[in-house]
């Protein structure tokens, strides 16, 4: 996902935080500690108040977005980025509904994950707790502010937000509404803050001790820059170079529908496919059926020699295989076998989401086991790689790293755990000497 503000400043030195930013971050952390003590009901009520305030400020938010769009058009922002920047009434109402739905999800906090008697009267439990304060750097996408803020409040975390500069007016209007809502709840409004300058977003990287996790949503270069310039843990949300492999044994109509949806349903999304891999035995029949469908959807196709021989008009370069288009462009390669498809995916994939279309169960299971991406699908669109569609309520990003959380990061990815041990004068020396023995008896959760 491109367009994140620091991506334009990757060669800049990281400045120290200003006194004003330090004060804001310190205040936010104090309020985040209070938020962590709020009850499930209080956090639910806070989300509903946020949704109400967004409804009340709907016209002001949409007007601010119009100003952002006009400025972006004058700057000739790419169509894919304009699509993300645009916040119409439907998108806004959907985001508001999403906040209300998030309030109804089970509480991710105070969940007992382990309950064990180490000995009589010495009881251990592991409880889910908030991370603390998260810093999220994201693209110029106003609806992301609402999703991330709501996830933060529901999971008991404070949030420092930085969107792409093209969305500054929209994000500021949205945050003002969210804070108005929080002011009518038990949660302090300053548990959320918005950074609007490049200098602030860079200085965020030096707020270790005040920020517990940074989630950058952007290019690999952005994620790498942040990892190299902060001591704060980083949860990388990088490029979405997703693949669809069409096996030789396949339901042709189904595969065409899945391919078109995976590319054209919303091409600016990171879970849209960028490369289509076709088994050589199915490629002629598939392309005969798919070329008109792609043309109707407005998709520009770029193919290797074999694909061009079957009707693809433009040639794909080596760079195409490694490109996240975020647009109605799709690269097509014809492969001799699934092994060749797996090799291509291993070389070029960003480990986001890969799909196989096949009717052969054994082939599907092998693909699902061999591909090391956050999401691996059979016979369905890559566009299902989404926190809302997974039933997470929303997502703060999609992690393409191997360590958890992986894939769409929802509420569960924004909590950690704490061990609590309750005793009655127990001392380690008694166990070291053999005077007492551990029982390690698991208790009901």
From Swiss-Prot:
Keyword field contains Secreted: no
Under Enzyme Commission nomenclature, its number is 1.2.1.41
Pathway it belongs to? Amino-acid biosynthesis; L-proline biosynthesis; L-glutamate 5-semialdehyde from L-glutamate: step 2/2
| Enzyme class, spelled out | oxidoreductase
List the PROSITE patterns: PROA (PS01223)
Q: Which domain of life is it from?
A: Bacteria
Annotated catalysed reactions: L-glutamate 5-semialdehyde + phosphate + NADP(+) = L-glutamyl 5-phosphate + NADPH + H(+)
Q: Which HAMAP family match?
A: ProA (MF_00412)
Similarity-based family: Belongs to the gamma-glutamyl phosphate reductase family.
Question: What's this chain's function?
Answer: Catalyzes the NADPH-dependent reduction of L-glutamate 5-phosphate into L-glutamate 5-semialdehyde and phosphate. The product spontaneously undergoes cyclization to form 1-pyrroline-5-carboxylate.
Stated name of the protein: Gamma-glutamyl phosphate reductase
Organism equals Synechococcus sp. (strain RCC307)
Query: In the UniProt record, what gene is named as encoding this protein?
Result: proA
